[in-house]
Design a protein with these regions (language model features):
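Membrane-embedded helical hairpins/re-entrant loop segments and their flanking transmembrane helices
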Residues: 52-95, 275-349
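Short, non-helical or kinked segments that cap or interrupt transmembrane helices
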Residues: 71-72, 93-107, 149-158, 212-218, ...
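Hydrophobic, membrane-embedded alpha-helices of multi-pass small-molecule transporters
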Residues: 27-44, 185-196, 214, 230, ...
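Membrane-embedded alpha-helical modules
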Residues: 115-233, 354-446
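Generic transmembrane alpha-helix signature in multi-pass membrane proteins
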Residues: 48-52, 60, 109-118, 141, ...
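Intrinsically disordered, low-complexity non-transmembrane regions of multi-pass membrane transporters
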Residues: 1-32, 237-261, 297-302, 446
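N-terminal signal-anchor module of multipass membrane proteins
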Residues: 2-99, 107-115, 119
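Hydrophobic alpha-helical transmembrane segments of multi-pass small-molecule transporters/permeases
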Residues: 29, 33-37, 130, 154, ...
Length: 446
């Protein structure tokens, strides 16, 4: 039986923002959609920058040019928007019909770098592996009814908690200024991050009605404004708008994303590269299963349905294959946006569709994407720490519903002892194995 949140309605109303179906006036839908985009924008582009800056070309051993990397960032926005549309409004059995945002996954970084930096495979071999791996995961999703019985409630709860735990350092890294930056932990990063978090909390209490759930967007705007003030006043270099000018020089104001088959870097399909990445797609499937479960339990107040699991994983896989066709990296459901959905209870698909369309629009106008990308990491960190914690909270609520017996104790204990423990070891636990094994498991609690 469908809950009141899921009733089939076609009307336009502000109250629909808390319902799955129906439309919301654009003056409300666009800000809430934009909030989702800002929550994931930098994380969506960062993996592309990391991998594509290091990759070599199989054809000549050279690196991708700056203009080519900019075009791939453009493609990352485009495919994330397309993948989100498929999740929101399924085509046949492909899509969950749930408020899920898709984006480029960090999970694949290690394995993709192994392939992309191998001169015998290079960028072309990496793209071929992404296409094949995406198709593989898509069919794994479509066959979910055959293996769903092994995914018990306690396992699902552990996966959701693990996702939340794995994101906690991501939020704190951002608050500190971003992982690997020279001025990490500088006072101005901490001040701007704290200011952003305080604005988020205060606006959630002060604003009334649906507007209180725009607290993350309000925090982003005020935090960004403070970062600009610090930059203009010469206090700290937190915002750099030079990327906008550089983007216009390299790809222009308007540009259509290109299929990789129409470039000089056509994909190469290598069986070894596929096997390197296939197991990571299974890990990604576990993450998406946990994220989809968190949406259903945390936002809709019910268990995950088989057709939703099947459709969600199918999009996870097939949209990754589409991403590969544009020369980009695999997609997955974005956990920070799952946290935003469960925290605000804004589940309306039309509203989140506005976010997907903003992503697609930003891909067609690269300077717009460059503007979003200028958002300081500290501002994002201040906004996301609470969202990431809310994912872990939903997992704990799911675990509370499980029967606490010896079997549950063993599953939970071993899941976190091994899963989380591996991410905390002082060295490479899998040093005796091929490097790809360590790349997959050492830094991934899920």
């Amino acid at each position: 039986m469908e809950s009141n949140k899921e009733e089939k309605i076609t009307s336009v109303s502000e109250e629909n923002i808390y319902k799955l179906n129906g439309r919301v006036p654009l003056r409300k839908a666009i800000p809430f959609g934009l909030q989702h985009v800002l929550a994931m924008f930098v994380s969506n582009l960062a993996p592309v920058l990391i991998v594509c800056s290091a990759t070599v070309l199989r054809s000549n051993g050279a690196h991708l040019s700056s203009a080519e990397i900019t075009q791939l960032l453009q493609c990352a926005m485009f495919v994330a928007g397309i993948g989100t549309c498929l999740q929101l409004y399924p085509i046949g059995v492909i899509g969950s019909g749930l408020p899920i945002i898709m984006g480029v996954s960090f999970t694949f970084l290690g394995s993709l770098l192994v392939i992309a930096t191998n001169p015998d495979l290079g960028y072309e071999g990496m793209v071929g592996a992404v296409i094949l791996g995406g198709i593989f995961e898509g069919f794994v999703g479509l066959s979910a009814k055959y293996w769903r019985k092994y995914l018990t409630p306690v396992v699902s709860a552990c996966v959701v908690i693990a996702i939340g735990l794995s994101l906690l350092p991501v939020g704190m890294d951002s608050w500190g200024g971003g992982s690997g930056v020279k001025d990490f932990g500088s006072w101005y990063h901490l001040v701007v991050g704290a200011f952003t978090l305080i604005v988020c909390l205060v606006s959630r209490e002060v604003l009334k009605g649906v507007y209180k759930n725009l607290n993350v967007l309000v925090g982003l705007v005020f935090g960004y404004a403070l970062a600009i003030i610090f930059t203009v006043a010469g206090i700290a270099p937190m915002v750099d708008f030079s990327g906008i000018h550089k983007t216009i020089q390299e790809v222009g104001v308007f540009s259509i994303p290109k299929l990789v088959f129409l470039t000089s870097h056509k994909p190469v399909f290598n069986l070894g590269a596929f096997f390197t990445i296939a197991i990571v797609f299974l890990v990604s499937a576990a993450e998406t299963t946990g994220a989809t479960t968190a949406v259903c339990t945390g936002a809709l107040g019910r268990d995950l349905k088989m057709k939703e699991l099947r459709g969600s994983l199918a999009v996870d896989g097939f949209s990754s294959a589409i991403s590969g066709c544009f020369g980009c990296l695999p997609l997955t459901s974005f956990s920070q946006n799952i946290g935003l959905v469960t925290m605000t209870q804004v589940i309306n698909r039309f509203t989140i569709l506005m976010g997907a369309l903003i992503l697609i629009l930003a891909s067609l106008f690269p300077p717009l994407g460059a503007f979003f990308n200028s958002l300081p990491q500290a501002v994002l960190g201040g906004c996301t720490v609470m969202m990431f914690g809310s994912i872990m909270y939903e997992g704990i609520k799911m675990l509370k519903e499980c029967k606490f017996d010896d079997r549950t104790m063993i599953i939970v204990s071993l899941s976190f002892s091994i899963g989380v423990g591996l991410t905390q070891t002082s060295g490479n636990f899998f040093a005796a194995f091929p490097s790809a094994v360590g790349d997959v498991f050492n830094g991934n609690a899920v």
